[in-house]
Every structure is written in structure tokens, then in C-alpha cells.
Amino acid sequence: MTTWAALIRWAALRPQDLEDKKVFVQAGSGGVGTFAIQLLRHWGAKVATTCSKENHNLVQELGAEITIDYRKEEFSDLLEGYDLVFDCLGDFGGVDSVTKCLNILKANATSHYISLNHAFIRTIDEKGLLLGLPAALKLRYQVKKSAKPINFHWSLYRPSSSGLSELGRMVRAEIIKPVIDSIYPLENIKEAHEKIATSHARGKVVIEVKKE
């Protein structure tokens, strides 16, 4: 639903808008990235992504045509003329990372940059409202002052019954196959959060509330 909300709700894109479009998914082997690659590929997009070398086979199986080892290669040196950046790393990568994402986009009004990590939420979380708000505003200014004339979106999760229904259909039809990194019982939720915090989960981290 995170991917659906970002593309459909915030960027106001339709599946047909992505046919044959060049899309870059930053951090494609995580819980959201593995889902985004499959959905975008199903809608006809040509997907490039970053991940560790160990996860290249995974993202290729999901539909990525170009895989970049972020530890050894700089995606901004390899990619250009993209229509959409779906940035799962977002502002956690800092101004430099976001700027590189913007630089690979076509400079026109049909290009989109979507970040899943809102600068306001992160900086206020880290520094509190008093210090976090000015820091977020500064970050936003630094990024947007060098941005091309594109559509810039900071996405937040928003529920959608129609979206959930359609995604459920895709999963049942095996168009989208959820990638599970690990499953934790509810009493081990702290360990699950610690796993997510490493930013090295391979797919989704699942909390098992009740085992039948």
C-alpha cells in the first residue's frame, strides 16, 4: 500500500502513464522496493534499481532490468534521462543523495521524484519540533533550489480500499509475490524493529500477531 499511495494518490499517476517509462527505484531490495519493482514492471515500466551485489539476482527476478551495486557504483554516473525516481531511501540519504536522484531525471513537467521519507518527519523525530522544523525547511530549500522543473512529491501512507482490493487480486494471481525477510512473534517486536533499523532487510519484516 505504500507504493500504491505514492504512485496513485500523491503523484496522481495511472498505470498507463508508466508504460515504457524509465523508472529508478532507489534501494530496491527492501520491503517497499521489492514491491515497487514488481508493480512498476507489471505496469510496463523499465526499472533500474540499487542494492547490494548479494541481492542482484533477487531484484532481477522481480523485474529490474538494470541493477547497480550501491557499494561500488554511483547510480548518477550510470543513469540519465529517467521519467520517474521512486526513492525508498529519500532524505535519510541526505541532500547529496536526493540531488543525484533529481539529476538523472528528464528536465520536463512530466518527470516525477517521489520520496518515501519526509524530511519534516525525520528531522522533527531526531531533533524535536523546535530544532527539527527549521532543519527540515532548510533541507527542503537546499534540494528544491537545484531541482529541475519536475513534479516533486514527499509521500505519506494513505489507506485505500480500492487499492487494497486491486493489490490483493495481484497477489492472488501471483503478479506480485511478497518477499519476506523474516517473521517475528509479537513478543519479539523489539528485535523486529532493530532488524528494520539496520536498513538491510531483504524484503518485508513480518510481525506474527497470533499463530493459528
Can you annotate each of these PLM segments?
Residues M1-E212:
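Terminal helix/beta-alpha structural elements that buttress the NAD(P)+-binding lobe
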